[in-house]
Regions:
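CheY-like receiver
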Residues: 61-117
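Conserved acidic carboxylate
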Residues: 16
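Hydrophobic "anchor" residues on beta-strands that sit immediately upstream
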Residues: 12-13, 63
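Switch/coupling loops of ABC transporter nucleotide-binding domains
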Residues: 10, 40, 89
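Acidic, metal-coordinating helix/loop segments flanking the phosphotransfer/catalytic sites
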Residues: 26, 44-63
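Non-catalytic signal-transmission and effector/linker regions of two-component phosphorelay proteins
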Residues: 1-11
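Two-component/phosphorelay signaling modules centered on CheY-like receiver
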Residues: 19-43
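Alpha-helical elements of the RecA-like P-loop NTPase motor core of helicases
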Residues: 23, 53, 102-103
Length: 117
């Protein structure tokens, strides 16, 4: 989805292997952006592998919401690969499984936000 204009447009990626959680994050973001008249573009990815396949183009995103627990390439591994391309992408980790959350790993790597789904 894209809302265009002359001002800065926030480019947001949602990377989660569960469709219902991608939709929930997407809906929350749309509501917030529209209420605050913020221009945005939101893209969704089913896996870390799909997102990383963008290569250098993943640096176009301002914010990436990453599920911590995904098959093939989990959120932490995906974040490491993002950092190899760009230090400017703001990463938000999300998870539905708080008991499995790698909070220490997130803090040690100086990522800023961690949120339960």
């Amino acid at each position: 989805m894209c809302v265009e204009g002359d001002e800065h447009m926030f480019r947001i990626a949602i990377c989660d292997d569960e469709r219902q959680f991608r939709k929930r994050i997407h809906d929350i973001l749309i509501e917030y952006m529209n209420e605050n008249d913020i221009l945005y573009e939101i893209d969704e990815f089913e896996s870390g592998k799909d997102f990383i396949s963008l290569g250098i183009n993943l640096a176009k995103y301002d914010i990436v919401f990453l599920d911590v627990n995904m098959d093939e390439l989990d959120g932490m591994e995906t974040a490491q690969k993002i950092r190899k391309v760009s230090n400017d992408v703001f990463i938000v980790f999300v998870t539905a499984f708080i008991t499995c959350a790698p909070q220490g790993r997130i803090q040690r790597r100086s990522y800023k936000i961690y949120s339960e789904k």
